[in-house]
UniProtKB/Swiss-Prot annotation:
An example Gene Ontology biological process: DNA-templated transcription
Catalytic activity: RNA(n) + a ribonucleoside 5'-triphosphate = RNA(n+1) + diphosphate
Taxonomy of the source species: Eukaryota, Viridiplantae, Streptophyta, Embryophyta, Tracheophyta
Protein name: DNA-directed RNA polymerase subunit beta'
Known partners and oligomeric status: In plastids the minimal PEP RNA polymerase catalytic core is composed of four subunits: alpha, beta, beta', and beta''. When a (nuclear-encoded) sigma factor is associated with the core the holoenzyme is formed, which can initiate transcription.
Length: 682
């Protein structure tokens, strides 16, 4: 389907009978309209050709071989525009055989049939709109009971029989016995309604705006009543209010999409294109057919039987007609969703038939396996591992995957640089893994983004673009900040990598899909690139420190050994009695850590700017140390003040660790970079 902006899209919803017939009908030169499948046959057992008006009819679905009709005549497609496009004898159109992948047919049902998705799936849309119990509607659909039509001021059979109830449970055993087929049909059309036709009438009589108004009034009345004091009654009222909300939302959706509720009852049943339900000949001359073909045959057999009962048979009891309508309803239910809330239908080998729902739903369905998860060229797959040294917009590709994905680009580069005279020599250089191959691969990857996808792709952040870099190993390296968008972790998850080929795809990847341009959740607007899992553990370990305060050196001999026999430049830091290091800048502390003179979690004193905010006004020093020159140090829980003889503050030291310093510097650099970028943008 193509919308007004020329975008290809797929829309799933209910359609009108007119739209179904428009999809299938074709007008032949003699004025005959074809498109309706009336016979349950597939191929003739002698000629091995599709049966006319059957499930594989060439008049309805197109020729099996391009440009060849059922008679065997051949015509070049599009060569002679003046000649008729249809064969005059068999009525087959001269067209490409690929039309059998999308040309549909239809079955004209002899009675209305309820779509099982809207009736039996929970929540039931039909039950919600009609505000009736699902069990009652199922009994009505499967002809277990009926309801009387309101006919005012007219004598009716039901009045004569004294049956004035709205729902008549006893019709199945009494009323049909009085009529033949035509008589019962007349009686039913005039006085009672049953089957899917009754559902269709009630849906057609609905005014959705009145449904919304009545539901809203009832919801407000229930809300004004308040609590009854009975827990069971309160729960019942709560469930009723939830139901009314769902009913209003459903009615609004029908109004917004301009869909008529009676479309949930089928009069025409679409028939899938033959290529989507093939019959394949295997070794030994045996045929292997899709289960959907057998289910379609079952529907056509029962529908044709019902048609014959309604048209030709004049003495058949009305009860038999009702039973046949029930069989048609069950056959269509099995075709659309086999076994929904019941026992599934099985073949002779006790194997469950795969219905239309089974074909499209689930991990192995048409959408997830064939359309979304199918194998494509220029793609690869591997396990993901954390890449902490990567930028947010980069990903690490293993050499083995990268050379396969970009092989055609590398071959073109080798030929352009006159390093290979033809494709064969270029491929041999790639197989031998010559150094020049990796250089050209690096150049190609610098200007070509890749797409990473993690199944299931439930929202748009399931596919993001990255700038690839070569890494060793066989796993894809990923920045941990992008894991939340993919719903990925590093416990064995796999991701697929794709190469956008066209210029439009590359432009879309760069402008819309790069990971650093998708920092907010499209659903709620919250930041989605937040530290999770490995990053949180790393930040915890980095800033864990030692929680024993200033007494750590005095009572932990293991830490004291870290400083024994260490000679340190007095310009960088000096020792106290407990050998607790003093640093005059964060650079000195990080340098000492890189030289392995201190460990990551070792408490240290870092000189801080004279900021009075770090000093608690009511805090009492834990210890005061006096120097020989009259200066002294006031030691608190997390900071230290050096005062002069006149009690003036000379300097302040804060208690920290190398891990805290590293974390603080990373945040500071990030904030400064953001401020610079913001100032440039404004």
């Amino acid at each position: 389907m193509i919308d007004r902006y020329k975008h290809q899209q797929l829309q799933i919803g209910s359609v009108s009978p007119q739209q179904i017939s428009a999809w299938a009908n074709k007008i032949l030169p003699n004025g005959e309209i074809v498109g309706e499948v009336t016979k349950p046959y597939t191929f003739h057992y002698k000629t091995n050709k599709p049966e006319k008006d059957g499930l594989f009819c060439e008049r309805i679905f197109g020729p099996i071989k391009s440009g060849i009709c059922a008679c065997g005549n051949y015509r070049v497609i599009g060569a002679e525009k003046e000649d008729p496009k249809f064969c005059e004898q068999c009525g087959v159109e001269f067209i490409d055989s690929r039309i059998r992948r999308y040309q549909m047919g239809y079955i004209k049902l002899a009675c209305p049939v309820t779509h099982v998705w809207y009736l039996k799936r929970l929540p039931s849309y039909i039950a919600n709109l009609l505000d009736k119990p699902l069990k009652e509607l199922e009994g009505l659909v499967y002809c277990d009971f009926s309801f009387a039509r309101p006919i005012a001021k007219k004598p009716t059979f039901l009045r004569l029989r004294g049956l004035f109830e709205y729902e008549i449970q006893s019709w199945k055993y009494s009323i049909p016995l009085f009529f033949t087929t035509q008589g019962f049909d007349t009686f039913r059309n005039r006085e009672i309604s049953t089957g899917a036709g009754a559902i269709r009438e009630q849906l057609a009589d609905l005014d959705l705006r009145i449904v919304i108004d009545n539901s809203s009034v009832e919801w407000k009345e229930l809300g004004d009543e308040g609590s009854t004091g009975n827990e069971w009654e309160d729960r019942k009222i709560g469930r009723r209010k939830d139901f009314l909300v769902r009913r209003m939302e459903l009615a609004k959706h029908f109004i917004r999409t301009n869909v008529e509720p009676e479309r949930m009852v089928l009069c025409l049943l679409p028939v899938l294109p033959p290529e989507l339900r093939p019959i394949i000949q295997i070794d030994g001359g045996k045929l292997m057919s899709s289960d959907i073909n057998e289910l379609y045959r079952r529907v056509i057999y029962r529908n044709n039987t019902l048609t014959d009962l309604l048209k030709t048979s004049r003495s058949t009891p009305g009860e038999l007609v009702m039973c046949q309508e029930k069989l048609v309803q069950e056959a269509v239910d099995t075709l659309l969703d086999n076994g929904i809330r019941g026992q599934p239908m099985r073949d002779g080998h006790n194997k469950v038939y795969k219905s239309f729902s089974d074909v499209i739903e689930g991990k192995e369905g048409r959408f997830r396996e064939t359309l979304l998860g199918k194998r494509v060229d220029y793609s690869g797959r591997s396990v993901i591992v954390v890449g902490p040294s990567l930028s947010l917009h980069r990903c690490g590709l293993p050499r083995e995957i990268a050379i396969e994905l970009f092989q055609t680009f590398v071959i073109r580069g080798l030929i352009r640089q006159h390093l290979a005279s033809n494709i064969g020599i270029a491929k041999s250089k790639i197989r031998e893994k010559e150094p020049i191959v990796w250089e050209i691969l690096q150049e190609v990857m610098q200007g070509h983004p890749v797409l990473l996808n993690r199944a299931p792709t439930l929202h748009r952040l399931g596919i993001q673009a990255f700038q690839p870099v070569l890494v060793e190993g066989r796993a894809i390296c990923l920045h941990p900040l992008v894991c939340k968008g993919f719903n990925a972790d590093f416990d064995g998850d796999q991701m697929a990598v794709h190469v956008p080929l066209s210029l439009e795809a590359q432009a879309e990847a760069r402008l819309l899909m790069f990971s650093h341009m998708n920092l907010l959740s499209p659903a709620i607007g919250d930041p989605i690139s937040v530290p999770t899992q490995d990053m949180l553990i790393g930040l915890y370990v980095l800033t864990m420190g030692n929680h024993r305060g200033i007494f750590v050196n005095r009572y932990n001999p293991c830490n004291r050994r870290n400083y024994q026999n260490k000679t340190v430049d007095n310009n960088n830091y000096k020792h106290t009695k407990e050998k607790k290091p003093y640093f005059f800048s964060s650079y000195d502390a990080l340098g000492a850590y890189q030289q392995k003179r201190i460990n990551l979690h070792r408490p240290l004193w870092l000189r801080w700017r004279l900021d009075q905010r770090v000093i608690g006004s009511r805090e009492v020093p834990i210890e005061v140390q006096y120097e020989s020159l009259g200066t002294y140090q006031e030691i608190y829980g997390h900071y230290l003040i050096v005062r002069s003889v006149k009690k003036e503050i000379l300097c302040i030291y804060i208690r920290t660790t190398v891990g805290h310093i590293s974390f603080y510097r990373e945040i500071e650099e990030s904030v400064q970079g953001f401020c610079r970028a913001y100032s440039y943008g404004t």
